[in-house]
From Swiss-Prot:
This protein binds to the 23S rRNA, and is important in its secondary structure. It is located near the subunit interface in the base of the L7/L12 stalk, and near the tRNA binding site of the peptidyltransferase center. The keyword Translocase does not apply. This is Large ribosomal subunit protein uL6. Keywords: Ribonucleoprotein, Ribosomal protein, RNA-binding, rRNA-binding. It comes from Malacoplasma penetrans (strain HF-2). GO terms for molecular function: rRNA binding; structural constituent of ribosome. One of its GO terms (cellular component) is cytosolic large ribosomal subunit. One of its GO terms (biological process) is cytoplasmic translation. SUPFAM superfamilies: Ribosomal protein L6. InterPro entries: Ribosomal_uL6-like, Ribosomal_uL6-like_a/b-dom_sf, Ribosomal_uL6_a/b-dom, Ribosomal_uL6_bac-type, Ribosomal_uL6_CS. The gene is rplF. Part of the 50S ribosomal subunit. Belongs to the universal ribosomal protein uL6 family.
Amino acid sequence: MSRVGNRLLSIPSGVNVEVEKSLVKITGKLGTLSVPFDSKKLSVLNKDSMVIVKRANDEKETKMLHGTTNANINNALIGVNSGHTKKLKIVGVGYKAAVNGNKINLNLGYSHPIDLEIPAGLNVTCPQATEVVITGADKAVVGQFAAVIRSKRPPEPYKGKGVAYSNEVIIRKVGKTAEGSKK
């Protein structure tokens, strides 16, 4: 039994939900998001300020789609109402970030700076030179852009230098020591 799929999703005040044939349009103060679903295997109902996702049968694929669709609709409801946020921290001597217009400029120890285009619908800020905050309505786009920034210099296990999520735990390794080596 899919516990995620059977959750009833409450619609926050100020959010409008429209169910079309195979698309759920969710509109709120931060924009409009559309969540597609398979109308042959699932049905989405909008009743009494609640969104209900039901499945047609108990096949394995249908159960998987049931939970995924329910989670995607829930992410969209939260996104258009309060938004999603990812925070990145930059660790390393001379490593820094700055936002210039619709681009983010990263200096990560390479011989050249890295410029990345900020996707539409995202708000990227740098409260400090070693901190990046990404906010937006679409959770997938926020997470994907944070992953792209992190991939430019992932944290290394010896000194922890690189770009990491603010809540990420970096497993550290012990480096080579002069005392421990045998000659």
